[in-house]
Amino acid sequence: VPTQRLCGSHLVDALYFVCGERGFFYSPKPIRELEPLLGIVEQCCHNTCSLANLEGYCN
């Protein structure tokens, strides 16, 4: 799965594409309580993320 760096309006556009009518939020849902949570900017702009990562921010 290709990953890419998404920042600013590119990140918002990608979220609209992936989440559609479900909408999205900027803090991830914790998968495990001990896992440190990265915000979407840290995950997808400072680093790279995939469409699957983005889907974790959909409502």
Swiss-Prot record:
The protein's name: Insulin
Annotated family: Belongs to the insulin family.
Pfam families the record matches: Insulin
Annotated source species: Chimaera monstrosa
Any GO MF annotation of the entry: hormone activity
Record-annotated disulphide pairs: 7-45, 19-58, 44-49
GO cellular component, one term: extracellular space
GO biological process, one term: glucose metabolic process
Function: Insulin decreases blood glucose concentration. It increases cell permeability to monosaccharides, amino acids and fatty acids. It accelerates glycolysis, the pentose phosphate cycle, and glycogen synthesis in liver.
The keyword Transcription regulation belongs to this UniProt entry's keyword annotation: no
SUPFAM superfamilies on file: Insulin-like (SSF56994)
Keywords: Carbohydrate metabolism, Disulfide bond, Glucose metabolism, Hormone, Secreted
Subcellular location: Secreted
Note: Due to a substitution of the Arg in position 31 by an Ile, this insulin B chain is longer than most other B chains and is processed differently.
Keyword Secreted: yes
